[in-house]
Amino acid sequence: MAFAPPLPIRRRKVLIPRPRSRFLLVTCPKCGNRQVVFSHSTFRARCLNCGEVLVEPTGGKARILGKIERIYG
């Protein structure tokens, strides 16, 4: 009974992990001010002009309450 020789082990390319978080340009629904916020924010981000809450933390990704204009990164 002959066994086949073991196949050579192929190494996979090491993938560089990339962050899933992004910076977002968000427009305030109340006054229209545009502001950059973090997508995984751990605190409430308020509009610098009117004080309206733009981002609420949820324990992971933050809930974005304004309109997302652009995604950076």
Curated annotation (Swiss-Prot):
Binding site for Zn(2+): C28, C31, C47, C50
InterPro entries (alphabetical): Ribosomal_eS27, Ribosomal_eS27_Zn-bd_dom_sf, Ribosomal_zn-bd
PANTHER family in alphabetical order: 40S RIBOSOMAL PROTEIN S27
SUPFAM superfamilies, A to Z: Zn-binding ribosomal proteins (SSF57829)
UniProt GO BP: translation
Annotated organism of origin: Aeropyrum pernix (strain ATCC 700893 / DSM 11879 / JCM 9820 / NBRC 100138 / K1)
Gene Ontology CC: ribonucleoprotein complex; ribosome
Keywords, alphabetical: Metal-binding, Ribonucleoprotein, Ribosomal protein, Zinc, Zinc-finger
Lineage: Archaea, Thermoproteota, Thermoprotei, Desulfurococcales, Desulfurococcaceae
Subunit (UniProt): Part of the 30S ribosomal subunit.
Primary gene name: rps27e
Free-text cofactor note: Binds 1 zinc ion per subunit.
Co-factor requirement: Zn(2+)
Protein name: Small ribosomal subunit protein eS27
Record's keyword annotation contains Zinc-finger: yes
Family stated for the protein in its record: Belongs to the eukaryotic ribosomal protein eS27 family.
